[in-house]
Amino acid sequence: PKHCSIYSGLSYADIEKYLRCTDFIIKPISGHGARNTYHIASERQFNDLDISNPHEYEAEEYIDGELYHIDSVMVNGVILYSQSFEYSYPCIEYKKGKVISSIELDDTSALSEALSRYNLEILSAIGGTHVTHLEVFVKDGDIIFLEIAGRPPGGGLVPLHRITHGIDLANIAMRFQMDPYYVPSIANQRLKYG
């Protein structure tokens, strides 16, 4: 989505003009989940925010779409493992008491295949050796990049991958840090249905 940096003295009107929208998200540049993340839909909401370090935040266009994540293992630019999931709700809905969960997509579905191609395109541009967590929105059939992290997913997703596919993304990420030549053995087989 369109986005801009936050700094002292920035007004709602400034953000509205730059993003060309009245609905936007304020979130930390370096964060996880929906911690310290705010959906702003009015000037009053923006003015009521109490952000002590504005330079650590950004504003981005609010997208009303379905949120997905693709978790991957890549070695020397080659994807060894990738799995797509739909979030039950966008992560910010957790603040409203909604339970956030991930629903694994059927690998053969058209959407899963489209997300896999998109993930390949993004990761090909990045290259290297990583565990990644890519988040995208899908709105009216379009895939919209939200963010990517060079780390395993949060929440209960590491155990989910371990239980369902026998892949421990946290362990793999740690091994990548310790041994630049480490190549995990990945069978990518479904072990258990939940």
Locations of the language-model features?
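Active-site nucleotide/adenylate-binding loops and adjacent lid/helix of ATP-dependent enzymes
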Residues: 1-65, 75-76, 102-117, 121
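A short, glycine/Asx- and small/polar-enriched loop/turn
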Residues: 19-21, 139-144
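Generic enzyme active-site microenvironment
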Residues: 25, 133, 145
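Short secondary-structure junction motifs
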Residues: 35, 129-133
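Short secondary-structure junctions
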Residues: 54-55, 126-129
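Cytosolic beta-strand hydrophobic patch enriched in CBS
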Residues: 58, 133-137
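ATP-dependent carboxylate/phosphate-activation module, predominantly the ATP-grasp catalytic core
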Residues: 61-127, 138, 145, 149-177, ...
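A glycine-rich beta-turn/hairpin centered on an aromatic-Pro dipeptide
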Residues: 183-194
